[in-house]
Regions:
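Phosphate- and other anionic-substrate recognition elements at nucleic-acid/protein interfaces
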Residues: 1-94
Length: 94
């Protein structure tokens, strides 16, 4: 399985693709939030061998275009709460 982590900010995102046990499939790269670049990203992710799952944090409204384009392309997309991700990373459970 391919695990895609996307760090979303205003106007651009940083994308990294890994497999279990830390195998890097695609080194981190930047994607601008233009229709062409997001569609290119969707194509690049769909071309990967095996199942691909995308996770990104909810960041104001910035994440929405990224999530919608990838979802509309048929990719599994999970938008997560950043506070929950911080708690998990710090091993704090509610």
């Amino acid at each position: 399985m391919n695990e895609v982590g996307i760090d979303v900010s205003k106007g651009k995102s940083m994308v990294c693709v890994m497999r279990p046990f830390g195998e890097v499939v695609l080194e981190p790269f930047e994607v601008l939030h233009t229709a062409q670049n997001l569609n290119d990203l969707a194509g690049k992710l769909k071309a990967l061998d095996g199942e691909t799952r995308v996770v990104l944090e909810a960041t104001g409204n910035y994440h929405k275009a990224v999530a919608f384009v990838l979802h509309d392309a048929g990719l599994f997309v999970s938008v997560v709460n950043p506070v929950l991700m911080l708690a998990i990373s710090m091993d704090i459970y509610f």
